[in-house]
Amino acid sequence: MTGATPTPRRVFVLGGTGTIGRTTVRALVQRGHEVVCFVRPRTAGAEARQQSVQLLSGATVRFGDVTNPASLARDGFQGERFDVLVSCLASRTGVPKDAWAIDHQAHMHALAAAKAAGVSHMVLLSAICVQKPRRAFQHAKLAFEAALIASGLTYSIVRPTAFFKSLSGQIARVKKGKPFVVFGDGMMTACKPISDADLGAYLAECLEDACRRDKVLPVGGPGQAVTPKQQGEHLFPLLGQTPRFKHVPVALLDAIVWILAALGRVIPPLAAKAELARIGRYYATESMLVLDPATGRYDANATPSSGTETLFDFYARVLKGESSVERGDHAVY
């Protein structure tokens, strides 16, 4: 990126209240863009709406239902013209019903509304795991990616590796003197995690960077790829402790999936839990790096890096009380 001042654009944002959405909105506002965020409060009432407004300072906040095309048009776009659609929207759980409703169908509605509003460019936050799809949410994301590419709009599809919050769930247990949990030997997967702020900046830069147009963009954070074992090896010294690990066999995850799936045939709520377990197993056994289609292997060197903050910088800030860990629906530990 050059130091040139960005051309201000009207930007319509989905998913702005999530952790990545908030940093993306902040980066867009800082770059001088006129940002309108379309959100649905987690709870009804004026207080919840005010919280959303405070989270998205500098942006205009509009409320409605992203799954309802009429609400998108009436409450969101409101007959106005926009230049860019930015989506950080994602299903909360990844179970099939949720995934197809949000990761695919809601985005299809938004794409149609955006085209009607004159949008010419869409920046989509996707996920690097879609390059090896095994679960419903990955197929749903891929289906929308394909629709966006075929839409005629300029597109920037950003596929980040791992988020800091996804790799920070064990800080509290290690502080309590417990071992760091790894699957297998703790070395069978690796990732190049990226911070919320660095990813938000990357997404915002897609509006100005011509090299990111009509591209699928895998991106990780700075530095070398790290394994779960290396995460623990860095965390313990920050606490003045000797590294200790608890090794969990992947076969245990397989057993949990099998049991929940069997019970889910007679107890429907457990079927959803079985899918969550399958998602957990996927992340426990697959690296979040660029996949080389020729070899079928993950390649850290082929995974682009962006930003300045490393996972271990973040660990240090959390332990100093300078930052906090926001856990999500995909929390494992």
Where are the model-predicted features located?
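Substrate-binding strand-loop-helix patch
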Residues: 190-197, 219-237, 249-258, 309
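Glycine-/Pro-rich loop/turn segments that contact NAD(P) or position catalytic residues
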Residues: 91-177
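Substrate-positioning beta->alpha
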Residues: 106, 186-207, 215, 227
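Glycine/proline-rich active-site loop of Rossmann-fold NAD(P)-dependent oxidoreductases
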Residues: 166-173, 206-217, 241-243
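A hydrophobic C-terminal alpha-helical subdomain
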Residues: 84, 251-333
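NAD(P)H-binding glycine-rich loop region in Rossmannoid oxidoreductase-like domains
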Residues: 43-117, 129-131
